[in-house]
Curated annotation (Swiss-Prot):
Disulfide bond sites: none
Keyword NADP among UniProt keywords: yes
Organism per entry: Pseudomonas savastanoi pv. phaseolicola (strain 1448A / Race 6)
Name of encoding gene: folD2
EC number assigned by the record: 1.5.1.5, 3.5.4.9
Name this polypeptide is given: Bifunctional protein FolD 2
Binding site for NADP(+): G165, R166, S167, S190, I231
Pathway participation: One-carbon metabolism; tetrahydrofolate interconversion
Pfam families in the cross-refs: THF_DHG_CYH, THF_DHG_CYH_C
Any one biological process term the GO annotation gives: tetrahydrofolate interconversion
Amino acid sequence: MSARIIDGKAAAARVLEQVSTEVKILKADGIEPALAVILVGNDPASEVYVRNKILRAEEAGIRSLEHRLPAKSSQAQVLALIAELNADDSVNGILLQLPLPSHMEEARALQAIDPGKDVDGFHSENVGGLSQGRSVLTPCTPSGCMHLLEETCGDLSGKHAVVIGRSNIVGKPMAALLLQAHCSVTVVHSRSTDAKALCQLADIVVAAVGRPRMIDASWLKPGAVVIDVGINRIEDQGRSRLVGDIDFDNALSVASAITPVPGGVGPMTIAFLMKNTVTAARQQALAQRSQSEAVCLSTC
């Protein structure tokens, strides 16, 4: 048996096409979705990520606003910029590119973003809402993973899913989304003593641990669907290349479907950032309309 390779690029293109259609509908109603991206410093990887996000936004018809601050900027300067963007009704989404310089508190900066404009889904109000099953802006990578799983598996109800990793960005929200889809969910991490044995029972494995090729075929139940969130740069025969947390070639003979690295989850993350931006624009427009109607009713 050779696993089906899940094409994240093609899936992301379909999501972005839908986003583009939604943007056109909003623009016809006088609403122009706008995404503000804040980049502090000039980290090379962050530069690439920001460039890709802005390019995808422009392709989808979303107005992008890039705000650059020097690496030596103070926490207060970052917070002041966030406050300015929070107050700007023409800005629907705010993305703070991570990591921040070491002298800054990431959590404090993320908490300063208006939850309704928090298109990364990192604000505690959105995190709490997700855990309660409320309709909130959810983290982009787990949302993209869920889309790939639903396209691949259909109904996920009753499936046993194992999430490897418990980060706030991927592991925890991934587990919450799988629970919402009525999966039985197990989270394993660096302190788990039986991680491999638990993975061997899983219908779905989501790897987000940040260790290159950590999981090979011996970890997998035959026929498991494998989502590899890991992005690790390694030296291979004198060349630098990207690999995931899954030993891809080794796992192909056991899994029924698997995402590659690159070309799997990565494109979905950016696609769902655009989707969140459009969702935020729509929700803000509805809120403003409701507020205007309420004012009219009270004064007319």
